[in-house]
Amino acid sequence: LRLFTFKTALALGVGLTALSGWTSSVRADDAPPVPAIPALPAGPGPATQPPAAPGTAVPAPTQPAAPAAAAAPPNYKLQYNGLIDAYYLFNFANPKDVSAGAGETYYDIRHNSPALSLAEINVFANAAPKHFGYKATFMTGDTADINHADFMGASHGLGEARYKNVQQLYGTYSLSADGAGIDLGKFYTPFGYEVTESNGNYNYSRSTAFNYVPFYNAGARIYTPVPGLPALTATLYLVNGVFNTTTMGVANDSKRLGYMGQLNYTDPKGKFTLISELGLDKQKFYGSGGPDTKVVVNDNNLTYNFNANSLAGLDYVYRQTKPNGGGKETVNAYAVYFRQQLNAKNAVALRFSGAEDKYEGGTVVAPDGTARPYDITATYEIKSTANFLTRVEYRHDHINYNNGANPGFYGGNSIADRSDQNTISLSGVFTFGQ
């Protein structure tokens, strides 16, 4: 579940050690729910275009596409596409345990060991106006394990979701030709600036802010362009869990609906994209069998294009959880991005991301009750062919504690006694299909 505090994040390495015995591959999360997973464009921006509606495009801010010379006719036939994502990461502290490689990141967590992060295939048929369509996303690897893990429920035999290899499975009905429609099933969450598939992001690793929003949801979503404002799309979600664990998001045992909404505005001139989401719920936020917890999560992000080769992005996440019995947690997280396309094949991307994670009662993870993690990340990418992307990335992480009860990052003796972590990674993503 993507409700990571750093105690949970550090538990991830331990959990994956066990999970690695069950699967031989490595994983991912926010694949764009579009009819294809295109490779990164020559110009700046992630691999997906701005969403007209959640049923047809990724619900995350992206670089607006350049005007096309001629639009291709709609394709309503069966289609498929996918990707393979692998990496090698070295932690300069050189921990002995390969699963203790990068305690603050989500997917690139293996140290000094080549790893398959994600193998994914999408099968879909776009919905013609007044007709039905569908999409299924199948995946394996560490990404599938992490997206569907419930570490707090592991002692109850609930360490993984049974259908972890089915990341998305939903039907679509197109209400009109202008992009209105309804989806029913399991789909990626609208929250977050970054997505599961690394080639859809500016950097290979995910930001600190990414740690505080969900991975996926299950239920219904209804979306439509706002009358009189065709650049603005509104979406309403009725789900069985704003956050997801083995039970939440697929069979939420709180027996209550969660409510989410999204507003997505794309500047008609292509200068910026602005997206805001809000989620309200009362669910078993702290794992299977935990207390009922009031949940509020809000995500706001902006992408601004300076020109055809340069862009900046901003992301702000607010999350508050109030479990029955006390122990309120309030999170304010942020990320700042800059991407520069150098030429047709090369680009650089910089990111600074952090959070203030405050506990009032309950578990105290820092001397003053507030965890303040941050990361500084620099990425150089090489797009050698249309369907292969290589990245070299340096990342520095910091947390404001490293005491025995609440450990920090792992050192060379595999003891989590450090406040800082430095890693470098080499990754490759191969895409295929239509």
What are these regions (language model features)?
Residues 70, 106-111, 156-159, 172, ...:
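Outer-membrane beta-barrel proteins
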Residues 92-100, 146-153, 162, 194-201, ...:
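Outer-membrane beta-barrel translocator domains and adjoining extracellular loop/strand segments
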Residues 114-121, 164-171, 216-220, 257-261, ...:
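Hydrophobic, lipid-facing positions within transmembrane beta-strands of outer-membrane proteins
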Residues 176, 227-229, 307, 343, ...:
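Residue-level recognition of beta-strand termini and adjacent short loop/turns
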Residues 231, 254-256, 261-374, 432:
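Detector for outer-membrane/organellar transmembrane beta-barrel domains
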Residues 382-384, 388-392, 416-434:
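Outer-membrane beta-barrel "beta-signal"
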